């Protein structure tokens, strides 16, 4: 009888086998799209950025892209869990990513404390009264208070320049103020010519006359 080739997704190194039972499946994380193969090494690894939990896979399409927010920089993986999450402070909208470089930093003025995010919209803006010049931040602690004597109602601020100074005749001893309302008037009969004053001590007695 004619010899029968092992089918796609299988191989056999047995010479003179009387049965197809000697044809073994390629393992998960691999596929084989040709017949008559005689070595396990003939099985083709799923590429970087992909995985497959299918045993005996016959086509490359069995290899599934790692989800956005993850990447995989090596080949032949069997599990979705093998895909590596982008670090905190980063995100990636790309499916099937093959490099950590695909994970982009959250922009300055924002942070992200958890891993595996897939869009920039997941990055959390610093609240009003704070700012951060740090990109790729994994903690809200990088959002710094506007100093006393200033305030800001902007979210996601990237610079202390966003913090506006209390005007003349006013002061504020409160860091992280979110409104002009934090600026208090000098008491009756006193004035201050200073911008961004932090204390009532800057308020001087009005000159008689």
PLM features per residue range, with description:
Residues 1-209:
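Disulfide-rich, cysteine-dense extracellular ectodomains and adjacent flexible linkers of secreted
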């Amino acid at each position: 009888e004619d010899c029968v080739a092992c089918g796609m997704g299988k191989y056999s190194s047995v010479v003179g086998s009387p049965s197809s039972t000697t044809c073994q499946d390629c393992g998960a994380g691999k596929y084989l799209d040709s017949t008559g193969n005689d070595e396990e090494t003939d099985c083709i690894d799923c590429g970087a950025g992909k995985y497959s939990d299918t045993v005996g896979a016959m086509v490359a399409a069995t290899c599934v892209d790692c989800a956005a927010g993850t990447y995989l920089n090596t080949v032949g993986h069997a599990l979705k869990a093998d895909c590596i999450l982008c670090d905190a402070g980063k995100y990636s909208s790309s499916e099937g990513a093959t490099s950590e470089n695909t994970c982009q930093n959250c922009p300055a003025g924002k942070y992200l404390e958890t891993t595996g995010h897939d869009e920039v919209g997941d990055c959390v803006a610093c609240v009003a009264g704070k700012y951060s010049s740090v990109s790729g931040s994994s903690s809200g602690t990088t959002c710094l208070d506007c100093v006393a004597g200033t305030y800001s109602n902007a979210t996601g601020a990237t610079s202390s320049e966003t913090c506006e100074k209390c005007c003349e005749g006013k002061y504020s001893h409160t860091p992280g103020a979110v409104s002009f309302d934090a600026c208090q008037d000098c008491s009756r009969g006193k004035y201050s010519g200073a911008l961004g004053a932090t204390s009532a001590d800057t308020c001087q007695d009005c000159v008689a006359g």
